[in-house]
UniProtKB/Swiss-Prot annotation:
It comes from Leptothrix cholodnii (strain ATCC 51168 / LMG 8142 / SP-6). Homodimer. It is found in: Cytoplasm. Its main location: cytoplasm. The reaction proceeds by a bi uni uni bi ping pong mechanism. (R)-pantoate binds at residues 64, 157. The keyword Cell membrane does not apply. Signal peptide: none annotated. GO terms for biological process: pantothenate biosynthetic process. This is Pantothenate synthetase. Pathway: Cofactor biosynthesis; (R)-pantothenate biosynthesis; (R)-pantothenate from (R)-pantoate and beta-alanine: step 1/1.
Length: 286
């Protein structure tokens, strides 16, 4: 496995692949990798086969962090990450410095569709999806993959990026990787490392709240808004500060109508809440 830090070295490393018309699968990450990231790399490898090339990027993207968020304390663990990526099937790691990817202020940005990007995460983290779309579009332009793999744990992000690829007619197949969970059900996340021992145990309450909410919505008997408000109240009583707990249509993340719920329309429960100093997200389809 090769590790490169500059655009010139990346392009040189990929030149033989392009000359041979090989398939490139790309897995963008911010590093501090866990088994969920490695599963995405394995999925990329499986998609392109032994003859393909799997590229992973490691870059903590300042554009998607608000000033009060955890950009400065987000762990940078390149040496450890590289040790994990090689046996997972990665061929090439692109780990640029900020000045390499943004040599001057990034004044041209990708503004995602507000109908999707200003809901939920976009509402509570203004500018987040603009930062995500801008860096991913830039990385797509640099790497020029035929396949890209993103985790379904970031459910709304995956939807936004799929729409971006579609809207710009990019020749990229976007794959979603299933959320991996610890043995007790906690969704794997780089930010789980911020949790203390007691918080780590308590963190299971978020997925439990989503599961209960989804079940209550499917059972009917109360309006969706009432059930969502009750779920937030219950989680708040357990010491959390919820941004949202909601059930939405999988197609557009809009609230389902009562008739759609009764008809068994595919739904997803999504939640974001702060436990102590750590903001966690999760989702469950059902």
């Amino acid at each position: 496995m090769q590790i490169v830090h500059t655009l010139a070295d990346l392009r040189a490393a990929l030149a033989p692949v392009r000359r041979s018309a090989g398939t490139i699968a790309f897995v963008p990450t911010m590093g501090n990798l866990h088994e969920g990231h490695l599963a995405l790399v394995r999925q990329a490898r499986e998609r392109v086969g032994a003859a393909g090339t799997v590229v992973a990027s490691i870059f903590v993207n300042r554009l998607q962090f608000a000033p009060h968020e955890d950009f400065d304390r987000y762990p940078r663990t390149l040496a450890r990450d590289a040790e994990l990526l090689a046996p997972a099937g990665c061929d090439l790691v692109f780990a640029p410095a900020e000045a390499e990817l943004y040599p001057q202020p990034q004044t041209f940005k990708v503004q995602p569709d507000p109908a999707l990007a200003e809901l939920l995460e976009g509402h509570f983290r203004p500018g987040f999806f603009t930062g995500v779309c801008t860096v991913v579009m830039k990385l797509f332009s640099i790497v020029q993959p035929q396949v890209a793999v993103f985790g379904k744990k970031d459910y709304q992000q995956l939807m936004v990026l799929r729409r971006m690829v579609e809207q710009f007619a990019l020749p990229i197949e976007v794959l979603g990787g299933e959320t991996l969970r610890a043995h007790d059900g906690l969704a794997l996340s780089s930010r789980n490392g911020y949790l203390g021992a007691a918080e780590r145990e308590q963190a299971l309450q978020l997925s439990a709240a989503l599961r209960d909410l989804l079940g209550a919505v499917r059972a009917g008997g109360a309006p969706l808004e009432t059930l969502e408000a009750q779920a937030c109240t219950a989680l708040r009583a357990q010491g959390w500060l919820p941004d949202y707990l909601c059930v939405r249509r999988r197609t557009d993340l809009l609230p389902p109508g009562a008739d759609e719920i009764a008809a068994g329309l595919p739904l997803v429960a999504l939640g974001a809440a702060r436990l102590g100093n750590t903001r966690l997200i999760d989702n469950l389809e059902g």
